[in-house]
Amino acid sequence: MEEDVINILKSIGEDPTREGLLNTPKRVKKAYEFLTSGYRADITKIVNGAIFEEPTEGMVLVRDIEMYSLCEHHLLPFYGKAHVAYLPNKKIIGISKIPRIVDVFARRLQVQERLTEQIAYAIQEVLDPQGVAVVIKAKHLCMMMRGVEKQNSELFTSCMLGAFKENMVTRSEFLDLIRTGST
C-alpha cells in the first residue's frame, strides 16, 4: 500500500521525497488499516458473551453514538451519530457492545444505507429482540468538498425491524426519544 501512496503523490504532481511527505505513505497505510479494521472484526468476539437474561420489556436506547466511515465511492469520510434501540425479548446486551457493533460496520468502505441495515441486523442476530431500530444522521465529505459542494447537507437513514416496523406507537416513542431525549 505504501508504494501505491507514493504513486498517487507522484500522479498529483507532488514530490514524495520532500520532508513533509517522507512518512506519508506509512501514515496512510496505518490510517487505512485502522479505518477498515471492521473487515477483520468478529461480532461474536465483540459481544464476548455480554448477553444477560433479564425480564425487562422497556425500550433500550443508546443515542448519539459518534461514528465515522469511508464512502466507498470516493474514499472520503462521512461522520455523524447513530441512534440504536431494541426491545428486549428476555435478554439484554452490555450497553458498551452497541457502540462497538456500530464501529465494526462503520470501519469499512460503506454507503450509509447499508451501514444502517448492517447494524440493525447484527443486533437482531445476536440478541433476538422483539425489535431493533437504527437511525443514522451523517455529513458526507464527498458531498461537501466536491461534487455538489453542499456543506450543510445531512443524510438520514433508518432501519426498523420487528416491533419498530410493525407498531407505530413503538416507532413513535423511539423517534421522539432520539429527537428530544426526554423520557
Swiss-Prot record:
Name listed for the protein in its UniProt record: GTP cyclohydrolase 1
Pfam family, one: GTP_cyclohydroI
Residues annotated to bind Zn(2+): 71, 74, 142
Catalytic activity: GTP + H2O = 7,8-dihydroneopterin 3'-triphosphate + formate + H(+)
GO MF annotations, alphabetized: GTP binding; GTP cyclohydrolase I activity; zinc ion binding
Disulfide bonds: none
Record PROSITE patterns: GTP_CYCLOHYDROL_1_1, GTP_CYCLOHYDROL_1_2
EC number, as in UniProt: 3.5.4.16
Pathway the protein acts in: Cofactor biosynthesis; 7,8-dihydroneopterin triphosphate biosynthesis; 7,8-dihydroneopterin triphosphate from GTP: step 1/1
Keywords: GTP-binding, Hydrolase, Metal-binding, Nucleotide-binding, One-carbon metabolism, Zinc
